[in-house]
């Protein structure tokens, strides 16, 4: 399989403090990578570097197969919609095509079709004319995932997508993301605190550690590694 993203000896800082040191890993098209790690280990900094919005202190990130940073569909951490936010579901999803639209004043019929297909794929097409504030937390995340899907050519980057959702909505969203990976062959990079779900769904694990070397490998290799002992043990408490 073709490499879609390669990170070589990446070093990056947050507020002048080095949080990522000589990190190397790569993922191929169609893989599902979960990024784990304790608070302060550099997960958010890595996301910003992967998106191209934060320069690294050293090393390099290479996107493969002609992919550009604007071709990455990004779903940020869940935050409640602002009171009075006027946009409809279809307007929010269509905004995911801004990178495709460029400097044109209006969206093309092809871009509108991409948005419609994304809403259908996420099961929210019947909510297209609803206001964002009318949606449940799970529906809002599906809407934002549909927007990210409009941007994504081959890669989705999801930052703790189930944070704040109830168990039912979380399970449904995990299932949708898995289908996008398995059926649509979309490459997934997901930051997560849920080790059990990460081991269940991912094909690769990247664990960032603030006090020791980082880990990159398969879920099976991670589960049997010394690095996993602390994290898995903590979640069993």
Language-model region placement:
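Helix N-cap at the start of a conserved alpha-helix in ABC-type nucleotide-binding domains
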Residues: 167-169
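Catalytic Walker B motif of ABC-type/P-loop ATPase nucleotide-binding domains
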Residues: 156-159
């Amino acid at each position: 399989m073709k490499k879609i993203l390669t990170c070589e000896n990446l070093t990056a800082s947050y507020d002048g403090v080095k949080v990522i040191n000589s990190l190397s890993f790569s993922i191929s098209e169609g893989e599902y990578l979960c990024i784990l790690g304790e608070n302060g280990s550099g997960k958010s900094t890595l996301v910003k570097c992967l998106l191209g919005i934060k320069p690294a202190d050293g090393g390099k990130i290479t996107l493969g197969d002609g992919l550009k940073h604007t071709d990455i569909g990004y779903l940020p951490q869940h935050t409640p919609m602002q009171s009075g936010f006027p946009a409809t579901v279809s307007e929010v999803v269509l905004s995911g095509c801004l990178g495709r639209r460029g400097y044109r004043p209006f969206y093309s019929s092809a871009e509108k079709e991409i948005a419609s297909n994304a809403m259908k794929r996420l099961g929210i097409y019947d909510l297209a004319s609803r206001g964002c504030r009318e949606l449940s937390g799970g529906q809002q995340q599906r809407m934002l995932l549909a927007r990210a899907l409009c941007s994504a050519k081959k890669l989705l980057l999801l930052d703790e997508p189930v944070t704040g959702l109830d168990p039912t909505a979380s399970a449904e969203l995990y299932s949708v993301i898995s289908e996008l990976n398995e059926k649509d062959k979309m490459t997934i990079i997901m930051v997560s605190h849920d080790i059990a779900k990460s081991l269940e769904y991912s094909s690769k694990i990247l664990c960032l550690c603030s006090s020791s070397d980082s880990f990159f490998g398969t879920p099976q290799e991670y589960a049997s590694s010394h690095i996993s002992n602390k994290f898995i043990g903590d979640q069993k408490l």
